[in-house]
């Protein structure tokens, strides 16, 4: 295993470990929130405040761990690109050397075999290039355009929108839209006098 590959393994392991720690902190945050609810229900405001502080701290801890995991994952993706492209370059160099020998001897069978390898190697390069372009375009939130992040958040919110709206309606008292009430009819003395005059 080369130094690059060893570093890549360590980075991937670190990112995975940090992600697990982030999930653990998020789970602990939810537990602290439940404690807050119970403390408030029992009327223990001071204890609820302590649990709330713990929940906020765990939330921030989870977020920081997730950010660091994302940054490491971004670096490992770039390192994966270097490892893969180096391997492809080495294979291409071997094919080129084989082609030089084939051309010098003008051995048609050897030339045909080398060309087969050459074309296959280019196919591998195209596949790897496509993969790397995709990976480099979306490896981490650090490099992701803000509008993409906003769009993803909106999509997730839309998917959970029904449940979220129901919860909001249950917990919040939203004033109903004001509907204008028709004004009470006001008698016009002059109009009434005219109507009576017409009838007589």
Swiss-Prot record:
Keywords assigned: Endosome, Membrane, Protein transport, Transport
Predominant location category: membrane
Location in the cell: Endosome membrane; Endomembrane system
Pfam families linked to this entry: Snf7
One GO cellular component term: cytoplasm
GO biological process: endosome transport via multivesicular body sorting pathway; late endosome to vacuole transport; late endosome to vacuole transport via multivesicular body sorting pathway; mitotic nuclear membrane reassembly; protein transport; ubiquitin-dependent protein catabolic process via the multivesicular body sorting pathway
Membrane topology: Peripheral membrane protein
Subunit structure: Homodimer.
Biological function: Class E VPS protein implicated in concentration and sorting of cargo proteins of the multivesicular body (MVB) for incorporation into intralumenal vesicles. The lumenal sequestrated membrane proteins will be targeted into the vacuole after fusion of the endosome with the vacuole.
Family the UniProt entry places it in: Belongs to the SNF7 family.
Protein name: Vacuolar protein-sorting-associated protein 46
């Amino acid at each position: 295993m080369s130094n690059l590959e060893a570093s890549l393994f360590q980075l991937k392991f670190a990112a995975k470990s940090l992600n697990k720690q982030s999930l653990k902190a998020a789970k602990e945050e939810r537990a602290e929130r439940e404690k807050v609810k119970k403390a408030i229900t029992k009327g223990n405001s001071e204890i609820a405040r302590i649990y709330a502080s713990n929940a906020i701290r765990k939330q921030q801890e989870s977020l920081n761990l997730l950010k660091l995991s994302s940054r490491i994952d971004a670096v490992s993706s770039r390192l994966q690109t270097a490892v893969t492209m180096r391997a492809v370059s080495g294979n291409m160099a071997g094919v080129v050397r084989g082609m030089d020998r084939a051309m010098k001897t003008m051995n048609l069978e050897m030339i045909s075999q080398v060309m087969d390898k050459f074309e296959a190697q280019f196919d591998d390069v195209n596949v790897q290039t496509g993969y790397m372009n995709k990976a480099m375009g979306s490896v981490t939130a650090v490099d992701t355009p803000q509008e993409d992040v906003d769009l993803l958040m909106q999509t997730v919110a839309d998917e959970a929108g029904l449940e979220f709206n129901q919860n909001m309606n249950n917990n919040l008292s939203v004033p109903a839209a004001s509907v204008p009430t028709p004004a009470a009819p006001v008698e016009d003395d002059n109009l009434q006098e005219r109507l009576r005059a017409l009838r007589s």
